[in-house]
Amino acid sequence: MTIALGRFTKEENDLFDIMDDWLRRDRFVFVGWSGLLLFPCAYFALGGWFTGTTFVTSWYTHGLASSYLEGCNFLTAAVSTPANSLAHSLLLLWGPEAQGDFTRWCQLGGLWTFVALHGAFGLIGFMLRQFELARSVQLRPYNAIAFSGPIAVFVSVFLIYPLGQSGWFFAPSFGVAAIFRFILFFQGFHNWTLNPFHMMGVAGVLGAALLCAIHGATVENTLFEDGDGANTFRAFNPTQAEETYSMVTANRFWSQIFGVAFSNKRWLHFFMLFVPVTGLWMSALGVVGLALNLRAYDFVSQEIRAAEDPEFETFYTKNILLNEGIRAWMAAQDQPHENLIFPEEVLPRGNAL
């Protein structure tokens, strides 16, 4: 019996090996397998947005001007959502709505679905890029896990929320002022600021900003060797091989300030990862709830008493009145296709009036 020892080697590389070698080659801008998803999707999403904000009107979908060509600026231009009558159509260029007519496709809001879907897959491609590079250089995948937070928010706000409503029309349009309008809509129709998931999201994002500022300041404060530079600017040398700040000193400082402090770098940095990512995920879950029209806190007893007693008001009841005002004033302008008309006497007024 013959026993062959050694490793099996293929005489010729197949197509997969050739592609793998080219895609993962060390170059200035890494491509990778994830790049096959990331780069085309990012290119089309950004290209669609620039095209829409430059040339495409929203007259046929919202009755609005939304492009530089019509006189908008960077803050007021937008790629607007399709009309409510188009419901959840993917609005493919070759679909039954546009039938291959590019101009008609733009007028119907096809660029919005184009940008939203390519944007979502572009973000997913960027997360996969972080996974791929982490594996290549033998890192843990925490960067990719952290980036799942922004992806969850994007998908929940731009895709899941309108899927739960009557159509893409109720998603945010892609523009600065358009996003502000969407925030006002969320407050008026969902009382979003009183939603506990929104509260957790705010705590996560602002808490992360606070942690970031404290951490950066503490590291700068506890440097014991800036480098061997003769002046301040050469001393902040980013190529130093070793850490030159004192965790012990930082621990002693914050122990005196708060009575407690991080004594372990891994726990400290994991906490800085955990706070914002958890906040983003919680806010995304809250938006999924809004897609199903789940309500925030309702303090009905205060509303009943405020209705019965003109002298009783709380900040909550005032906000509820403001929400009613947003709904009444906004709906007629925001949904012109409904032909809503509210007589003056039904528009909400505060107790003081």
UniProtKB/Swiss-Prot annotation:
It is an enzyme of class 1 (oxidoreductase). Keywords: Acetylation, Chlorophyll, Chloroplast, Chromophore, Electron transport, Iron, Magnesium, Membrane, Metal-binding, Oxidoreductase, Phosphoprotein, Photosynthesis, Photosystem II, Plastid, Thylakoid, Transmembrane, Transmembrane helix, Transport. It is found in: Plastid, Chloroplast thylakoid membrane. CDD domains: Photosystem-II_D2. Chlorophyll a ChlzD2 binds at H118. It catalyses: 2 a plastoquinone + 4 hnu + 2 H2O = 2 a plastoquinol + O2. PSII is composed of 1 copy each of membrane proteins PsbA, PsbB, PsbC, PsbD, PsbE, PsbF, PsbH, PsbI, PsbJ, PsbK, PsbL, PsbM, PsbT, PsbX, PsbY, PsbZ, Psb30/Ycf12, at least 3 peripheral proteins of the oxygen-evolving complex and a large number of cofactors. It forms dimeric complexes. NCBIfam families: psbD. This is Photosystem II D2 protein. The gene is psbD.
